[in-house]
């Protein structure tokens, strides 16, 4: 059975990116897939922690935080066959809560390599407004040596009809993962 780890980042409860992630997850459940989801943007005060490195010349070693990301999220991602990243667009980039979790991959680059990936983003702007993110995700995907299974860039997410169409695409993408 395929194991899937979903990471979302929006701090908006029931926001547009949550709707996309929910639809994707419903599609996954059609195939009884083993799913773990972490909503980084909806965590309490102090979660998630940012990457911290030891202060040693020539050494770039992360300082373990023993927080939720370290104890639960990273182990679930290490077990996962597919990693799904879902963000909202903030100032032409992924949001900070989401980025904080991605930065924590640093100590696990080798263990996380060669997985499959899905990326989804929503934004109130245009496709062009998401160009920087598209480059960022392409570079992350190459660096991690992940196989891209699909991408959805949901522009004009304020438009409920358009968002519903993107949510349907997310559902179908989730359903396609076996």
Residue spans for each PLM region:
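Glycine-rich nucleotide phosphate-binding loop and flanking beta-alpha elements
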Residues: 90-91, 126
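Histidine-bearing beta->alpha loop at or near hydrolase active sites
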Residues: 156-158
């Amino acid at each position: 059975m395929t194991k899937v780890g979903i990471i979302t980042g929006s701090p908006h409860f029931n926001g547009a990116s949550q709707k996309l992630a929910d639809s994707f997850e419903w599609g996954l459940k059609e195939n009884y897939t083993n799913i773990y989801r972490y909503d980084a943007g909806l965590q309490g005060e102090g979660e998630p922690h940012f990457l911290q490195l030891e202060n040693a010349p020539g050494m770039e070693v992360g300082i373990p935080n023993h927080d939720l990301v370290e104890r639960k999220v990273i182990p679930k991602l290490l077990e996962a066959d597919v990693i799904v990243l879902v963000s909202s667009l903030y100032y032409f980039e992924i949001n900070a809560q989401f980025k904080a979790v991605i930065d924590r991959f640093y100590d696990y680059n080798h263990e996380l390599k060669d997985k499959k990936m899905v990326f989804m983003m929503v934004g109130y702007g245009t496709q062009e407004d998401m160009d920087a993110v598209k480059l960022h995700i392409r570079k992350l995907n190459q660096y991690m040596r992940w196989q891209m299974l699909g991408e959805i860039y949901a522009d004009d997410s304020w438009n409920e009809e358009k968002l519903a169409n993107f949510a349907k695409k997310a559902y179908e993408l989730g359903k396609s993962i076996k």
